[in-house]
Amino acid sequence: MKKLIAAFLALCLACSMAACAGGTTSESSTASTSSTSSESSVAEESDASEEPSSSDVSEASYEGSDTAEATVLSHEEYMAAELDTEVTIQAYVQAKQSYYAEQGTATVYLQDQDGAYFAYDMACTQEEYDAMTEGTCIQVTGFKSEWSGEIEIMDGQLDQIVEGDTFVAEPLDATELLGTDELEQHQNEKVSFTGLTVAPSTDANGNEAAFLYNYDGSGTQGDDVYFNVSYNGQTYSFVVESYLCGSDTEVYKAVEALEVGQTIDCEGFLYWYEGANPHITSVTVAA
């Protein structure tokens, strides 16, 4: 009987050990599978992080386009370009309007030996604006546009200040071109007019005046100053742009002192608004 009990106990012990061994194998297998899965996931995440995202590709493409060298157009090519197309030009600063600090832009009158350009609200820094002295060559990229007859570069930016030679244009005497189709071909150029007669304007109250603050007389000192001149029986509207020549400048004060009937000579830039509307920088009353 004792032998039978001993044999039974031995059998139970063997079964118990086998069960323990089986449990260990299962746990080991589970741990191994979990570890392998985790390592695979980490590897996949690592590979994914090394792949460029669509935004990365887009940024890389954009940066590449910035570095592409733009084709600089001659004045003839610029004039032949379609409206609303992007253009790049190089020309010399002849004058500039005040810097718009909030927008980071400036309006610049440009000219080379072949013609002139008007860069409206060109993006640049204050430091770049200060460096653009008369005669300085700059490169500008923007869109060729038309506004009320004026051909200009809009939404532009200063690409660079070009080191080297300088150029200051001599005014073209455009007096005899007044009233002709040829005058428009010199749009935005530095021009002069001689022997003009101050013609009357009508202010907001219907009174005759030699000049007006704003085109309709609704302004005050410090605003643009408009005045009429006549030549060969035709009357033209000229303006002193306050952002170009403020109320403290000689030309602004000279226009404020004009009298109807006086003979004057003028210099300025041949801006266009529904016809010739020069931005005047100098007025001299004939002796």
Predicted feature locations:
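Short, low-complexity, disordered segments immediately C-terminal to signal peptides
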Residues: 21-49
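C-terminal motif of bacterial Sec signal peptides marking the signal peptidase cleavage site
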Residues: 15-19
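Positively charged n-region of N-terminal signal peptides that target proteins for export
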Residues: 1-9
